[in-house]
Amino acid sequence: MKRIAYLWWALAFAILGSGAWIKSSHAQNAGYIAPSTMASAAINISTATTTKIITGITGRWTYITSFNVIAGGSGNFQLVYGTGSTCGTGTTSLTGAYNLTAQAGLVVGSGIAPALVVPTGNDVCVVTSAAVQMSGSIAYAQP
């Protein structure tokens, strides 16, 4: 009997330890983020522009688990969501505008739980205010 209990605990640990759990006010989306739904994208922008970095999926929320960025000069960095090629329709701020200076950066989130939540079907874009290099990455899931 102890062997069976041990096997159940080992199986539960293996399953639950291989991804992240999310709790959300959106009951249909609360639960487990399987590793197969996790992805990442590079942030590599050198102009004052709005750049799509995550394409939304109809019927799926996007959970941003972490992002990091470092600036090569002074400029603002902001995450927004919306639809269209540059999130131009229904544009909504996910973050405030981070005012970065040369060689300054930031890290948000641990990568194992949602730091930011994007409603179903919306794209995620980066808005930069100056023609300076902004480099980093963003980790997300669309379960």
Locate the predicted segments by residue:
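Sec-dependent, cleavable N-terminal signal peptides
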Residues: 1-28
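Beta-strand-centric surfaces of beta-sandwich/beta-rich domains
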Residues: 29-143
